C-alpha cells in the first residue's frame, strides 16, 4: 500500500546546529546582562564617592569662608603665636584652626521696634536657632554689635522674635532700632573654634571639629572620615594637601601673592597668618567597594592623581600614585577666599 504523504525529521547535524545557535544567543544575552550590571555598579560606586567627596568639601569650605565675619580689627591684630587667640589661630601643613560663625544662625532682620539698646526684633527663621543661642551679632553699615542680654527666641509664621536689653558697644542710645538696624540687616550667631586636621599613621583620618568660643561644653564633629586597614573599610584617603595664599606688601605698597605649605610639621608665623587671603585644600579618595580586578601590577605603570598642578607645585608632594588597580580613585579640591578676613587686613594697613 502506498503512503499518501511523507514526513521529515531533524538530522543530527541540524539538531546540533540549532542547539549551538540557541546556546550562542543565551550566552550573548548573558554577557550583555553581566556587562550592564558591572557598568551600573561601577557608575553607582563613582557617584557614591563623588557625593561623599563633595559633602566633605562643602562642609569644610563653608566653615572657612565665614572666617572673620564676627571679628574686629583688635581680634585680627593680636599675636597668634600661642595658638589660643586671634581669628586664625594655627595654620600648619595638616592642621588649621580658625574662628567662624558657621553653624550659628545666619539670618536677617524682618522688622524692629523700640529704641536702642532695648529693641524687639523679628528675624527670618533659621534652622540653627536653639535654646543654646544666647548672643547675636547685629550688623549695620558702621560695624556690628553683640547683644549683652537677649531673650530666648519665640517662633511664629512671621519669624523669630527676640528682645534685647543691651549691646556691648554702640553709641546710638535713644535712636529708633529700625533706623539703626533697618530691615535686611545681617544677623549672625556666635563664633565657633574650628579645627581641621588630617592624620596619617597606621590608617588615615580627616576631621573638622568645633567648639563654641564662649562655652567649651558645646562642641562636636562635623566631618569625621577615618580609615583602619585592619578592618573592612571601603574608602580611604591616602593624600590630603592644605595650602595658604599669602599676600605680602612692601613699604611702597607693591603686593605679591604666593601659595605656601609649611611642610615638615611646621606652621606659619604670626605675620604670615595675618597675610592669608585664601585657603585651598584637596584630597584623593579611594574606594575598593565591589572591586574584583586581579592581575600583575607594576607600580611604575600606575597612574598618578594630582591635587594641584600649577607651576608652584612639586609633583611628588601634590600627587598620589595609585598602588593597586583594585581601587577606584577620585580627586577633590576647593579654593576658598577669605573676604571678611582680608577686609580686616586692609583695615590694619590703612
Where are these regions (language model features)?
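Short, hydrophobic/aromatic-rich segments at coil-to-beta transitions
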Residues: 92-97, 205-207, 278-279
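Aliphatic-rich helix starts adjacent to a transmembrane/signal segment
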Residues: 8-61, 65, 347-349
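Short linear sequence signals and composition-biased patches located at protein termini or domain-edge surfaces
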Residues: 77, 86, 102, 186-191, ...
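N-terminal secretory signal peptides that target proteins for export/translocation
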Residues: 1-5
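Cys-His-centered catalytic/binding microenvironment captured across papain-like cysteine peptidases
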Residues: 166-195, 199, 203, 210
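Alpha-helix exit/C-cap motif
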Residues: 35-39, 55-79, 103, 142-148, ...
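Short, glycine/small-hydrophobic-rich surface segments
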Residues: 42, 46, 64-95, 255, ...
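Autoprocessing Asn-cyclization modules and mimics
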Residues: 82-181
Amino acid at each position: 500500500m502506498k503512503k499518501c504523504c511523507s514526513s521529515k525529521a531533524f538530522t543530527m547535524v541540524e539538531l546540533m546546529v540549532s542547539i549551538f545557535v540557541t546556546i550562542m544567543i543565551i550566552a550573548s544575552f548573558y554577557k550583555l546582562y553581566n556587562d550592564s550590571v558591572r557598568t551600573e555598579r561601577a557608575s553607582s560606586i563613582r557617584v557614591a564617592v563623588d557625593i561623599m567627596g563633595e559633602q566633605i568639601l562643602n562642609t569644610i569650605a563653608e566653615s572657612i569662608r565665614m572666617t572673620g565675619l564676627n571679628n574686629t580689627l583688635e581680634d585680627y591684630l593680636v599675636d597668634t603665636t600661642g595658638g589660643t587667640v586671634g581669628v586664625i589661630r594655627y595654620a600648619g601643613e595638616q592642621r588649621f584652626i580658625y574662628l567662624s560663625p558657621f553653624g550659628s544662625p545666619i539670618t536677617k532682620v524682618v522688622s524692629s521696634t523700640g529704641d536702642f539698646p532695648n529693641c524687639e526684633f523679628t528675624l527670618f527663621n533659621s534652622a540653627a536657632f536653639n535654646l543654646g543661642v544666647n548672643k547675636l551679632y547685629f550688623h549695620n553699615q558702621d560695624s556690628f554689635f553683640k547683644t549683652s542680654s537677649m531673650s530666648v527666641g519665640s517662633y511664629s509664621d512671621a519669624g523669630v522674635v527676640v528682645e534685647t536689653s543691651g549691646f556691648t558697644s554702640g553709641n546710638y542710645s535713644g535712636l529708633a532700632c529700625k533706623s539703626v538696624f533697618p530691615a535686611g540687616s545681617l544677623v549672625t550667631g556666635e563664633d565657633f573654634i574650628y579645627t581641621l586636621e588630617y592624620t596619617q599613621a597606621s590608617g588615615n583620618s580627616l576631621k573638622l571639629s568645633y567648639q563654641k568660643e564662649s562655652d567649651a561644653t558645646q562642641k562636636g564633629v562635623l566631618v569625621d572620615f577615618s580609615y583602619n586597614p585592619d578592618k573592612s573599610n571601603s574608602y580611604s584617603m591616602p593624600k590630603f594637601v592644605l595650602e595658604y595664599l599669602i599676600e605680602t606688601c612692601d613699604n611702597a605698597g607693591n603686593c605679591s601673592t604666593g601659595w605656601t605649605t609649611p611642610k615638615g610639621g611646621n606652621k606659619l608665623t604670626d605675620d604670615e597668618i595675618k597675610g592669608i587671603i585664601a585657603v585651598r585644600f584637596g584630597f584623593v579618595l579611594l574606594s575598593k567597594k565591589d572591586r574584583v580586578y586581579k592581575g600583575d601590577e607594576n607600580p611604575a605603570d600606575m597612574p598618578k592623581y594630582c591635587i594641584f598642578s600649577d607651576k608652584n607645585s612639586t609633583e611628588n608632594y601634590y600627587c598620589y600614585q595609585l598602588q593597586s588597580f583594585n581601587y577606584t580613585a577620585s580627586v577633590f579640591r576647593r579654593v576658598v577666599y577669605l573676604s571678611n578676613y582680608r577686609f580686616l587686613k586692609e583695615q590694619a594697613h590703612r
